[in-house]
Regions:
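Membrane-embedded transmembrane alpha-helical bundles that form the catalytic cores
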Residues: 2-504
């Protein structure tokens, strides 16, 4: 974290001192420096991705520009694209799945008395590989689809893939969203830099006051879930989800704020997710950039595939009903949620997590006509306040259960935690890692975050509102959040410096 801010401060200072034409080079040098310091000997992996994607995109562009035979060109381009995508997916799949797969096979061999052993390797994931790989693949597919023109300059492609504010945890950006901003150079604007700094402070508030504090209780209970029940299990379910939100959205605030200090606008990744009224809406508000990527490059790829369209077309002619109408969507959603689970890692709980949301969302789509008939029969207004409140509460239950599956470490631990909520437990909730005072600080922090989310949900731009106030009032807000971070940030003593959760993916 310290290295990140040192690089950021130096980069901002130098960025605005040199010519506009060369400012993108400052971003590249800062990004490469940061990545090399943090990832050290794993840096060649991102270099391989950048080189392979740059070469393939250049080849596709050259074929499009020079060849008159459209059919042959498309076939060659598709082959080149698929080989490059397979190379990059192969790298991440090997690094993520080799060790768990080897361990699984070795355990099977042992049980059947098969005299063989797959060597175990201590593999470490390169920094941000899950994020920059998706950006690279998205860029390549967009060039293939002729949505964008391939960038000729390798170093500009490298900057797009390794821009240091977003390399750790995203947000995952499409080339046409950020490339021009990265390359063009921006004039100094006090408001833009100040707004960026404010966004960073808000991210630090979420991370240091809420996420890292909740971690103490989460770790205490999740390390030995079978020893706890009742309120302890319930707090684990609630606090892990809130910790994940504060941690992940906190980093995104830092990333977006850091980019904003250069005049660069990254895509938002969260939009008040806990105000959603359905699981589908939740995923339109949570980890938005991943959802957009999966929709653009997995959902539409499957839904518009000739084989699926042909099969569903024949089925619709024989059986004209609601299910056959939505079947292409359901098949596409299955692959989207499978990819979502696999993207997070090789654990079964990640795959079940993806399938959990697939079942929830697809069930809602399948049963939609039934719900409409039920509302009509019972004379219930589906847009009424009572139904709206019910949907909101139902969605919160779905979210908390889903995130428990996600964060439990194993399906066994997830089941133990969820099934223990209604069992008696005689301990005190203040013996779970947070004493009374720390618990109160955590709750106040959570209330502050959700108050801000509520205000934003009402359409109020908080930063603009603060900026319109008189100077003393503005600085009172800024100083208050700085003092809060300094006084109540979770560092020193019983706290340790914690990495961002999604940095592990």
């Amino acid at each position: 974290m310290l290295i990140f801010f040192i690089v950021l401060i130096c980069a901002v200072a130098i960025y605005y001192l040199i010519s506009l034409r060369y400012r993108w080079i400052v971003l590249l040098v800062a990004s490469v420096t940061f990545y090399a310091i943090i990832s050290t000997y794993l840096t060649p992996f991102i270099c391989l991705t950048a080189v392979s994607v740059w070469l393939c995109a250049a080849y596709i562009q050259r074929q499009n520009d020079s060849s008159a035979d459209v059919k042959t060109t498309k076939k060659k381009n598709k082959t080149a694209m698929l080989l490059t995508i397979l190379l990059n997916i192969g790298i991440i799949a090997f690094l993520k799945f080799y060790s768990p797969f080897a361990a699984l096979l070795n355990s099977v061999f042992e049980k059947v008395n098969f005299d063989a052993q797959i060597p175990s390797l201590k593999l470490i994931l390169p920094l941000g590989i899950s994020f920059y790989t998706l950006q690279a693949i998205g860029y390549l597919i967009d060039v293939y689809r002729k949505k964008i023109i391939a960038e000729k300059n390798f170093f500009k492609v490298a900057l797009f893939l390794c821009f240091f504010p977003q390399i750790l945890e995203g947000p995952i950006a499409k080339y046409d969203q950020t490339a021009a901003q990265l390359y063009e150079g921006h004039k100094f604007d006090y408001k833009t830099v100040a707004f960026g700094a404010q966004r960073i402070l808000w991210g630090l508030f979420k991370k240091m006051i809420v996420a890292d504090r909740l971690y103490l209780l989460v770790k205490t209970v999740s390390d030995k879930p079978s020893e706890y029940a009742g309120i302890a299990s319930l707090l684990l379910i609630l606090f892990y989800t809130l910790q994940l939100y504060a941690d992940f959205s906190g980093f995104i605030d830092i990333a977006i704020g850091s980019a904003e200090m250069f005049g660069i606008k990254l895509p938002e990744n969260f939009r008040q997710p806990f105000f959603a009224k359905s699981a589908q809406e939740f995923w339109q508000r949570w980890h938005i950039s991943l959802g957009v990527w999966l929709k653009e490059y997995v959902f539409y790829t499957v839904a518009l595939s000739p084989r699926l369209m042909k099969f569903c077309g024949k089925l619709k002619k024989k059986h004209k009903n609601h299910f056959t109408k939505i079947l292409p969507t359901l098949v596409s959603l299955f692959f989207v949620w499978l990819c979502n689970g696999l993207w997070h890692g090789a654990k079964w709980n990640y795959i079940v997590y993806g399938m959990y949301y697939f079942v929830i969302i697809s069930s809602g789509m399948i049963c939609e006509p039934l719900f409409k008939k039920l509302y009509a029969a019972m004379k219930i207004n589906p847009d009424g306040k009572a139904i709206s409140i019910f949907r909101h509460i139902r969605t919160l239950f779905i979210i908390f259960i889903g995130e428990t599956i996600f964060g439990a470490g194993s399906l066994k631990n997830a089941w133990i935690t969820l099934s223990s909520v209604f069992k008696p437990w005689k301990g005190s909730m203040f013996s779970l890692g947070l004493d009374y005072k720390e618990f109160i600080v955590a709750i106040i922090g959570i209330i502050t975050i959700f108050t801000a989310d509520f205000i934003k949900e009402k359409g109020v731009n908080i930063r603009e509102s603060i900026a319109m106030k008189k100077l003393p009032a503005r600085w009172l807000c800024y100083i208050s959040i700085i003092v809060a971070i300094v006084l109540f940030g979770a560092y020193g003593g019983m706290y340790s410096l914690l990495p961002f959760i999604y940095g592990n993916f």
